[in-house]
């Protein structure tokens, strides 16, 4: 079957942050220095080749950009300064936009103004909705933060959280299914038995909760920052979805609040660290920043900061009116972050990375089995 090339693929990837792709002349230094570059995944060199040749379909089914954690060594060793690490990052953004069936990711990654406008619109609608509920339908009072007569009842907010969570899960689930189809499902040369999916399923929680592959890059600090950010966000999400009553209780529930404070500090600290790194540009993986990186980090700082402020206003200073106002402002950041960033932008990486580790192991196993079968039959390997 003929392979179609897209001559404008490099130009398209430039909208997602790719730089200096044409400088690459495939010396192989990047793949040689990468600790994860091994058969059948020889990156970044092979991915760079797909891009330069305009092999869009091969790039779409390629998991290698997700197997890269951008330690920066490939860019440091590149004699042509072709920035292979940053190109792999741009490929992840491009792949995210292709997995997304709605086209929202593509819009966001190609136009930071569109993403910012969407965030502001959702924030304003969220604020108006919560205020309308509190003043008109909730039956509470702005001067009451928790308990009987609360301006925003925990039960109503909890229902809203679950509805939003189900919508997000649906969008992200469909996009993850598309990721499977592009990388594994439509490849007729791969034969993956159902039992293999079950046998390798442990990779999903292992890589999600430990980010162990990043730790193997040899740079412990970036891994620790990344892990702290991911665990802090996951902890906060679990608290909001399952322990909101304890978080908003009139009495102090230290088990819930302890985890909440730790998660908030983790989000705030890691976000500020990443912002500082992108401003100073001292580390290789911080030298280049896409607009969506800035929006993502600023939104995280906003959400974490307002989360701490509304809790302090209520718990420490007993200023219920101020706490309610700040809580509405806080939700104006939370809803866009969950509703837009999780399924369509940066946060989607939390799902795609462990899935890529899972799918890549299934791919590698199937490829090895196929090669054994072909060798036994004495036939040439498929292209």
Please name every model-derived segment.
Residues 14-20, 61, 153-156, 214-224, ...:
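Membrane-interfacial loop-to-transmembrane-helix junctions in polytopic alpha-helical membrane proteins
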Residues 1-2, 92, 96, 383:
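Flexible metal-binding regulatory segments at protein termini and peripheral loops
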Residues 21, 38, 48-245, 249:
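Iron-sulfur-cluster electron-transfer modules
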Residues 1-65, 350, 358, 364-365, ...:
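Ferredoxin-type iron-sulfur electron-transfer modules and their immediate structural context
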Residues 29, 33, 73, 77, ...:
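Hydrophobic alpha-helical transmembrane segments of multi-pass small-molecule transporters/permeases
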Residues 91, 117-132, 158-177, 225-245, ...:
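Hydrophobic cores of alpha-helical transmembrane segments in multi-pass integral membrane proteins
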Residues 23-26, 60-63, 67-70, 261-264, ...:
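Secondary-structure capping and boundary motifs in well-ordered enzyme cores
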Residues 194-209, 302, 361-383:
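Cytosolic juxtamembrane regulatory segments of multi-pass membrane proteins
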């Amino acid at each position: 079957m003929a392979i179609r090339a897209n001559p404008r693929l490099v130009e398209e990837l430039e909208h997602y942050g790719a730089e200096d792709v044409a400088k690459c002349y495939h010396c192989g230094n990047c793949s040689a220095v990468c600790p994860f570059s091994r058969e059948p995944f020889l990156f970044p060199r092979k991915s760079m080749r797909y891009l330069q040749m305009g092999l869009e379909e091969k790039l779409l089914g390629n998991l290698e950009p997700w197997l890269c954690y951008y330690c920066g060594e490939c860019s440091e060793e590149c004699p042509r300064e072709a920035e292979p690490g940053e190109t792999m990052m741009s490929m992840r953004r491009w792949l995210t936009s292709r997995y997304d069936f709605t086209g929202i990711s593509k819009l966001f990654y190609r136009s930071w103004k569109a993403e910012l406008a969407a965030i502001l619109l959702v924030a304003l609608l969220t604020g108006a909705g919560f205020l309308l509920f509190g003043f008109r339908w909730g039956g509470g009072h702005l001067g009451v933060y928790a308990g009987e007569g609360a301006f925003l009842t925990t039960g109503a907010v909890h229902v809203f959280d679950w509805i939003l969570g189900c919508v997000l899960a649906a969008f992200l689930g469909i996009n993850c299914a598309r990721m499977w189809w592009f990388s594994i499902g439509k490849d007729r040369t791969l034969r993956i038995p159902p039992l293999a999916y079950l046998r390798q399923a442990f990779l999903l929680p292992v890589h999600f909760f430990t980010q162990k592959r990043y730790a193997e890059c040899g740079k412990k600090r970036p891994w620790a920052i990344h892990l702290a950010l991911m665990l802090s966000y996951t902890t906060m999400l679990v608290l909001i979805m399952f322990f909101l009553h304890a978080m908003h209780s009139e009495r102090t529930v230290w088990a819930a609040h302890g985890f909440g404070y730790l998660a908030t500090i983790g989000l705030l600290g890691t976000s500020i660290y990443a912002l500082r790194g992108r401003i100073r540009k001292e580390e290789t993986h911080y030298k280049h920043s896409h607009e969506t990186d800035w929006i993502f980090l600023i939104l995280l700082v906003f959400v974490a900061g307002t989360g701490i402020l509304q809790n302090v206003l209520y718990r420490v200073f007993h200023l219920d009116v101020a706490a309610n106002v700040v809580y509405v402002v806080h939700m104006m950041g939370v809803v866009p972050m969950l509703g837009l960033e999780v399924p369509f932008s940066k946060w989607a990486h939390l799902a795609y990375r462990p899935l890529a580790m899972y799918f890549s192991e299934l791919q590698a196993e199937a490829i090895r089995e196929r090669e054994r079968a072909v060798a036994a039959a004495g036939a040439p390997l498929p292209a």
